[in-house]
Amino acid sequence: MDFLLKQVFVGLPKTVGNKEAVNPMEREWTSAIFKEPAEGPVWVGRTGLAGDGQGDLKHHGGPEKAVFAYSFENYRYWQSELGISEITSGGMGENLVMANVNEESIAIGDTFQIGEAVIQVSQPRQPCWKPARRFKVKNLALLLQKTGLTGWYFRVLKEGYVGIGANINFSGPALSPVDHPKMQSNYSC
């Protein structure tokens, strides 16, 4: 089965919510989880995509978390499980939406060429509270972790442009593969 780059998302931090809100889910907060579809090819550099940013540099971004990817197929699960149709591609704050690949089919160290860029799986995403706030599902971070549908991070081995519809060429498995469930146990919250 061929892997496919379905969508590319970028976004800068923004503040949403209400300073005066009593309900914690409605209070003001800042995040870059609200990403927008990229128009045309996007430059992937060593620390991320052009036009993208993070609201919390302590926990997000940097060379080992340069690109966040999420499986297109995971969204159908979340829509069904949570009954929230608004949970769609880009909703988890990812940069790349990849089809025909998921947390069970990749391992730390797997290397892919997408367009001009060469990227390597560096670690699973550690679910934080921001998707829960975005979709107002208090235990979403825990659900993401329990299901293993967390997404994963890439480090960038070769910078270059990526664009929607690009084939994703699997250019090398990890020398000592660590599958995603094992990755999760090493990076849990």
Residue positions per predicted region:
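Loop/turn positions that initiate beta-strands
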Residues: 109, 159-165
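Short, intrinsically disordered/low-complexity patches at protein termini
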Residues: 131, 137, 144-145, 186-188
